[in-house]
Amino acid sequence: MEQGLKISTPNAKLVRGAVLLPSDKYVFHLIQSRTLCMALSMPGEYLPAPVLFDRFEGGSSGECSLHSRQNVCLYLVRILLSKHPYVLNSQLLVGYQHRQEAVVLYKQLLVKTKDFGISEIKLPCSIVVGPNPMSAEGTVQAERELPSCELVITSEFKTVWINESANQEKEFSPHDAISIPLAPGTPSKPIIKQPPFLPISKETAILHAQLFYAAGAGFPPIHNCPASAFTTLAVMCKSHNSINLVPELEIKPRQLLLLKHVLLTRMGLENCLQDFIQAYAERLPPLADEQVKYFEKVLGTAKDRAEDIIFILNSVGATSFTNRICSSNTDPMLTKAMQKYFLMFPPADPINALPFAVDIISIICQGANFNTVVLFVQRYIKIQERAAKTNQIKMFALLSI
């Protein structure tokens, strides 16, 4: 059973992820994630849940699919929301309404899968009231705005809830809804961090470096760390770690993954750095200042190369090639990474953009100077000098494939 907000306002209706009140206002969930907003081309860092109902096909008033055959870019939404992002047949649950009864919105948005059941989304969210279910503007917290709502233990089905601490038997009518008022909990803290690459504290820099060296020593024993963190890192090392930004260093795959997620952390984007901290909390080595400086140098190199790649891919994606391009690169991981990238950000010439991008990215990752790369590339395609508005979400995608 989940906590939910029971809205007893007469004539309230659950419509496509939002509750329509007689006053023409809407009650809906607001998800806090700048990355999610960028993935859906929405401004700001707060995304109304009804936007997901609008973008994904099918579903009902209280749930929508998290899989789209028409727009593969939406798979990023499932990665950001679901604890099981590889399950295509996932449903987002916001609440329910039986016939003309009161509407119940779950306190936290839920994701339902056939294999893993129901779990809360990974991002913080809250329930608000506003004039437009597709915008976060003008919204206020539902608990303040709605007099006829209460926090309840709720189930979509008729359920008997017994307080075992009372140490006595209780009988309930199967026809009565179970409703137990609870005090609202402390709102979740925002996970969005400072704007990109602001200076960090010395303690944070040391922690990131310690994680890097600890990851180089091996995977932590599974009996010494949370199973969820261990599994997440094991899966992401194989499935979300295709591009090696610093091949000359011959670092371990988990160290490469850590570099990428430290970059995401310092950009203020969603990341799995907390899983690294949980996994290696008992194995952090003491470091000298030179080791911390070395890590920051490696991180800076990875950052520069990732930015160079995005700059070049913007130009490649906008080009219609006049001649057929053949790649001399035989790295299957890099080819697969570019296939994933161009599925999310389709190029003007998919057939030729793929081999061209694979070869150029290989050159960048081997340490070629940015000016040298640009001089070489502009012999074949026109360079897009203006920064695209989607650069940050593209960076997230590049570091996650």
From Swiss-Prot:
Alphabetized Pfam families for the sequence: Herpes_BTRF1
Matches recorded under InterPro entries: Herpes_BTRF1
Domain of life: Viruses
Family: Belongs to the herpesviridae BTRF1 family.
Name by which UniProt lists this protein: Uncharacterized gene 23 protein
Species the sequence originates in: Alcelaphine herpesvirus 1 (strain C500)
Organism phylogeny: Viruses, Duplodnaviria, Heunggongvirae, Peploviricota, Herviviricetes
Gene name per UniProt: 23
